[in-house]
């Protein structure tokens, strides 16, 4: 039985998958298995996997595309290791990741998972030091070291932790049923919040022991709606005992519903969009943006899209968009 199970879910990224798998094969700690779970890729992923003649590599190919979370779960359910990590097919581990994270879990029985800091890399596997430093500061990773004192705050308020740079005890993931399919698109956020609510203990290594790839380009409207629906599901499913934290949850939920309502109106789902905008405005109050979106929802789609595109030109770019521009 391997000590560590490394799960790499993949879909149509054969070119990046090679880099990801080789980063595991080159680890200084070698007691692992690699589980590549393929969500019915239509590229040459099966042929790429065949090049590795190593009994530690297991390949699970889904018969049909079932979505990210379901594909990830298939790898988790197949895992045999005491410890478990999942990272995406376009990311990578630095050579000492397993050695240093395994040492913490071996030496500290009360710790359920170990997170590390990570690099930002571009399409050519080049590290961007400025983007890495900014990312670390934005998400509060640069102030963490050792046992994480308030895991729920780090997971829910600051969103400091990332699944792809974390080694877990597999049994702690089993205790919370790992990833929920309904959270597809914001699995990291949801998993860490549920681990915190279950009383699990996290540990943070400030070294940069993983590489996270940022891609250029914009996210599509369909992708944005998918993410916002998943985030709304997650926020609706939590209930915090602490009064102030519960207030934050309700405020965040209202904000997500407003953002989702705006995008549904843009997508032509007018009735559902208006309903969410009205619901969120009860908590946030009506704004000029919401009022305008409600008016636009009664206009033909061609007019609606024209005005939306014009307004978008004046919207300041968010953090993710700025980073994508830098690393692309």
Question: Can you name each region flagged by the protein language model?
Answer:
Residues 2-5, 33, 190:
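Cell-envelope/extracellular polymer assembly enzymes that use nucleotide-activated donors
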Residues 62-79, 89:
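Glycine-rich, basic loop-to-helix element that forms the pyrophosphate-binding segment
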Residues 70-72, 99-104, 110-172:
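Flexible acidic/His/Gly-enriched loops in nucleotide-sugar-dependent glycosyltransferase catalytic domains
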Residues 84:
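Short aromatic/hydrophobic "clamp" motif used to bind/position activated sugar donors
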């Amino acid at each position: 039985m391997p000590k560590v199970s490394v799960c790499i879910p993949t879909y149509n990224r054969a070119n990046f998958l090679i880099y990801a798998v080789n980063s595991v094969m080159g680890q200084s700690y070698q007691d692992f298995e690699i589980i590549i779970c393929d969500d019915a890729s239509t590229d040459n992923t099966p042929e790429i996997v065949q090049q590795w003649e190593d009994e530690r590599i297991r390949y699970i190919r889904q018969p049909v595309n079932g979505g990210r979370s379901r594909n990830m779960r298939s790898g988790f359910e197949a895992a045999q290791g005491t410890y478990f990590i999942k990272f995406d097919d376009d990311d990578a581990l630095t050579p000492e990741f397993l050695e240093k994270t395994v040492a913490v879990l071996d030496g500290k029985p009360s710790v359920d998972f170990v997170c590390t800091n990570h690099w930002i890399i571009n399409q050519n596997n080049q590290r961007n030091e400025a983007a890495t430093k900014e990312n670390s500061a934005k998400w509060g990773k640069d102030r963490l070291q050792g046992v994480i004192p308030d895991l729920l705050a780090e997971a829910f308020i600051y969103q400091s932790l990332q699944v792809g740079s974390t080694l877990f005890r597999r049994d702690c993931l089993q205790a919370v049923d790992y990833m929920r399919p309904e959270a597809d698109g914001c699995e990291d956020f949801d998993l860490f919040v549920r681990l915190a609510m279950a009383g699990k203990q996290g540990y943070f290594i400030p070294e940069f022991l993983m590489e996270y790839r940022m891609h250029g380009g914009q996210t599509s409207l369909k992708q944005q709606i998918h993410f916002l629906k998943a985030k709304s599901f997650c926020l609706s499913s939590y209930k915090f005992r602490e009064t102030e934290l519960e207030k934050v949850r309700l405020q965040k939920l209202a904000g997500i519903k407003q953002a989702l309502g705006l995008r549904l109106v843009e997508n032509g789902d007018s009735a559902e969009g208006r309903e969410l905008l009205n619901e969120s405005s009860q908590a946030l109050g009506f704004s000029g943006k919401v009022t305008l979106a409600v008016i636009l929802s009664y206009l033909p789609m061609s007019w609606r899209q024209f005005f939306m595109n014009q307004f978008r030109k004046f919207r300041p770019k968010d953090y993710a968009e700025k980073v994508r521009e830098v690393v692309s």
